[in-house]
Amino acid sequence: MPPSPDAPEAGSSRDRGWRVVQAQFLQSAPSVEACPPGDRPEIAIAGRSNVGKSSLLNALVGQRGLARVSRTPGRTQLLNVFELTLAGPGGARRTLRCVDLPGYGFAAARREVRQGFAPMIEGYLAEREALRALVLLVDARRGELSDLDQQLLEFASDHQRPTLLVITKADKLGAAARGLVRRRLADSVGVAPRDVLLTSASTGLGLQGPDGLAADLAALCEPEPA
């Protein structure tokens, strides 16, 4: 798959660090139509079941209980919407929404539930006007994209959605193994290794600072030209 032409690059929103200064859960929506009004830029967060979406979001905002962490893979079946305010250099601020998409790829989820995931996820990615980008999470211990990951990236590309690839649970691997996984994933989507973000909810790796996830979100949600 060719790299997204709109993936975040170094620029004004990444010159110095950004951090989340306020976060709140807004709602769980059973459909795209039930989501809040699209008056804020939105970032979709996707990945396989138990990839660590909730843990990463909690670590990013510094609130352990903001997003519920389920020990049952495939349990999240709604669009969970969170609003974040980020503070950056020179007093700059961004308010955006992170939309946690249903996890996918877990065999134990009921078939009818799994079949319901695809229309919801695809409908959101295709139809949501406020959506700025897709952030796809991949477990460092898997080390590669699944077929479903690939399909989601291709679907996002077909609908001109910028994508950001984020490796979770990087603390579970040594430095050499992390580098190998990063290069492998970068090669699989045709980007430079530096454009694949290494993160850990446990240690805070890759969340703050000029090259962290908070800065990437700020860059993706820069105000559009008038």
Regions found by a protein language model. Give the residues of each.
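Conserved G1/Walker A P-loop phosphate-binding module
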Residues: 2-108
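Canonical P-loop GTPase G-domain recognition
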Residues: 20-33, 172-226
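Switch II of P-loop NTPase G domains
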Residues: 35, 75-81, 91-96, 102-132, ...
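Helical mechanochemical/support elements of P-loop NTPase systems and associated helical scaffolds
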Residues: 39, 65, 78, 94, ...
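Conserved amphipathic alpha-helical interaction elements at protein-protein interfaces in regulatory
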Residues: 62-66, 127, 158, 219, ...
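Conserved nucleotide-binding/hydrolysis micro-motifs of P-loop NTPases
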Residues: 74-75, 103-105, 140-144, 170-174, ...
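Alpha-helix termini
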Residues: 86-92, 128, 221-225
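Conserved C-terminal guanine-recognition region of P-loop GTPase G domains, centered on the G4
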Residues: 118-194
